[in-house]
Amino acid sequence: MDGILSGKTIVVMGVANQRSIAWGCTEALIAQGAQVILTYQNDRLKQSLQRFVAPDVPLIACDVADDDNVERAFASIKQQYGAIDGIIHAIAYADKATLEGDFVNTTKAGYDLAQNISAYSLIAVARAARPMLKPGASLVTLTYFGSERAVPNYNMMGVAKAALEANVRYLARDLGPQQVRVNAISAGAVKTLAVTGIHEHQQLLKLSRSMTVDGEPVKTREIGNVAAFLLSDLSTGMTGDVVYVDKGVHLS
């Protein structure tokens, strides 16, 4: 039986390992019939992906810290695979020093780095991909509750995620006329490589779990299932939205 993404080609950006939310999304997309293309930042991450990604899944180099690199990556995708139906943007980074202590001590360099990689990169990706997005295409990015609440030890990343959510709304407006949608998933805390880089991350995970409605943490595959929906033709009426997939943590 065909899935809701059968016949669609989706680019997934940000898979680091098998615990990544981006990988949970990738598995959900494949289960729903999508052809996926994964991007990687550098050779080390490429080698990591090759350990668990099926050999028939294309891997394309893309370092979002450099606009020209992003343009080359999507030009390569277009040349090899043609137009695409969607993108998952699951990329974020902040210097560890900007996540701890008092936010007032954030440096300009730390601020700029987090905003560039975590928020601006979505704009760069949308711009590079725009000529190859089919009508009905969908872009999905990942955010977190720390964008609207002052979460301990999240600091600069919370500010970057707030900017990312604003980017979603403006990109949704700009890309709407060509029938391209842009949405964000606000995912619950999951023990990923990114989360383990947060000071006292175990406390964050414990607190998040205590706030879910059923006492169980959200799973990466559950997040991926919602991403699949947002990338499918079942969600054509949704754009510019932040969709919570956190088992009710945001209710508290």
Where are these regions (language model features)?
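Catalytic loop of short-chain dehydrogenase/reductase
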Residues: 14-25, 92-131, 135-177, 189-191, ...
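Short, small/polar-rich loop/turn modules that mediate ligand/substrate recognition or access, typified
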Residues: 176, 181, 238-240
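A glycine/serine/threonine-rich, flexible loop-to-helix segment
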Residues: 50-52, 177, 189-212, 222, ...
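Short C-terminal tail/terminal secondary-structure segment
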Residues: 228, 239-252
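Conserved SDR Rossmann-fold cofactor-binding beta-strand/turn motif
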Residues: 181-191, 231, 244-246
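Rossmann-fold cofactor-recognition segment
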Residues: 53-68
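A conserved structural motif in NAD(P)-dependent oxidoreductases
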Residues: 212-223, 234
